[in-house]
């Protein structure tokens, strides 16, 4: 399906913002391992903290394709920023779908306005793709809940104002015994135990969170008791589509740098781009980027049309994330030695993009999903 005028407008506006505001600052934020909070306000002013959230709740009222396009363009400016925005929109979407009116008023509107930053706390030290195996417990305590457990690799776990935390409320019920809670990060017992030292995306903090007798009010239960697993899975498709879009954006940034360098740098008396080996490499890079873009847009448009898209979302994420790492590696190769030093952006983009094959379901999980879909075709 062709993109509409709304989609072209958001692509143009976010691309302009990414090139003027994010690209010039990305290397410094990476070195400092810091994302300035004032940037969240700028993003919110463009509607990017609640792209698919209705206007009545402070959002931009756009569709999932618009969100994915925005993520792509943000990632072309800075991968870490796109991750922060992506998770914030994930939290906003969960609050929209499962939050009470009071929870939406208290949390969703401020998130969309850039006043609050959200985190998604599902993964645990020994639990990754199998969400049903979490061990964090939530027990009734007085008039509320007491949480105990450890969450691992939580994006914005330190800098967020609130986290959607998943915990077991009835072990005997298995998946149906998992619930979700809105946990303020200033709640007693919410402890940032460690900030991970990562290969890339340094400006986006990734934390280990310890919940130690963390007490929250009863009204912080999200949805209803026992629907946490359903909440966790409800955003699988959009999460994977957005990571695919993010991968395409970072690949595009690496490609832009590579083609600019290939036109400027001369070798054996002519620009690099005039050497067939280099032009062929660039041709493959451009083809992969466009293929990844079409895959994620197709999946996003299926979701907006209310049609099943689990297989298509997995295809988009699998292809785009692996393509993006290859494109970034090729961009380094085109730069030669300069590609391996921090004076040029491609080494940072290469570090940033590697994780896209891991989070929101590793590549082999995507292959498993696609394979199962084909078995039933």
Residue ranges, per PLM feature:
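Short Ser/Thr-interspersed hydrophobic loop/turn segments at strand-loop and sheet-helix junctions
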Residues: 47, 71-75, 167, 183-188, ...
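Short glycine/proline-enriched turns and hinge-like loops at secondary-structure junctions
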Residues: 62-63, 130-132, 156-161, 174-177, ...
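A short core secondary-structure module
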Residues: 148-192
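Short Gly/Pro-enriched turn/cap motifs at secondary-structure boundaries
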Residues: 84-85, 111, 126-129, 153-156, ...
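A short, Trp-centered hydrophobic/proline-enriched beta-strand micro-motif
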Residues: 114-122
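Flexible, small-/acidic-enriched active-site or ligand-binding loops
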Residues: 133, 186-217
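Alpha-helical interface subdomain recognition
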Residues: 1-77, 81-82, 90, 98-103, ...
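Long, acidic (Asp/Glu-rich), low-complexity accessory segments flanking structured domains
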Residues: 212-231
């Amino acid at each position: 399906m062709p993109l509409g005028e709304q989609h072209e407008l958001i692509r143009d506006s976010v691309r302009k913002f990414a090139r003027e505001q994010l690209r010039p600052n990305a290397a410094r934020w990476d070195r400092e391992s810091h994302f300035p909070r004032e940037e969240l306000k700028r993003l919110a002013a463009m509607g990017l903290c609640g792209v698919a959230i209705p206007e009545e709740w402070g959002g931009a009222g756009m569709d999932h394709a618009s969100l994915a396009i925005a993520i792509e363009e943000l990632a072309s400016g800075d991968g870490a920023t796109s991750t922060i925005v992506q998770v914030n929109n994930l939290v906003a979407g969960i609050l929209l779908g499962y939050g009470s009116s009071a929870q939406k008023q208290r949390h969703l509107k401020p998130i969309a306005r850039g006043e609050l930053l959200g985190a998604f706390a599902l993964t645990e030290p020994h639990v990754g793709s199998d969400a049903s195996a979490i061990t964090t417990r939530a027990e009734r305590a007085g008039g509320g809940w007491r949480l105990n457990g450890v969450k691992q690799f939580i994006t914005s776990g330190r800098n967020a104002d609130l986290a959607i935390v998943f915990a077991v409320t009835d072990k005997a019920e298995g998946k149906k015994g998992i619930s979700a809670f809105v946990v303020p990060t200033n709640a007693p017992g919410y402890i940032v135990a460690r900030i991970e030292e990562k290969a890339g995306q340094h400006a986006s903090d990734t934390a280990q969170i310890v919940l130690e007798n963390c007490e929250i009010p009863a009204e912080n239960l999200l949805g209803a008791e026992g629907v946490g697993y359903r909440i966790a899975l409800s955003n699988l498709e959009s999460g994977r589509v957005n990571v695919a879009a993010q991968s395409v954006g970072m690949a595009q940034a690496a490609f832009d740098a590579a083609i600019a360098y290939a036109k400027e740098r001369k070798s054996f008396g002519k620009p690099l781009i005039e050497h067939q080996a280099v032009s062929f490499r660039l041709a493959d890079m451009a083809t992969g980027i466009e293929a990844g873009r079409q895959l994620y847009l197709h999946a996003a448009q299926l979701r907006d049309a209310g049609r099943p898209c689990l297989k298509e979302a997995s295809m988009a994420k699998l292809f785009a994330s692996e393509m993006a790492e290859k494109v970034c590696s090729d961009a380094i190769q085109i730069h030669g030695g300069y590609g391996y030093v921090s004076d040029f952006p491609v080494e940072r983009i290469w570090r940033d993009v590697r994780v896209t094959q891991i989070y929101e379901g590793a590549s082999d999980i995507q292959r498993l999903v696609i394979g199962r879909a084909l078995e039933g075709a």
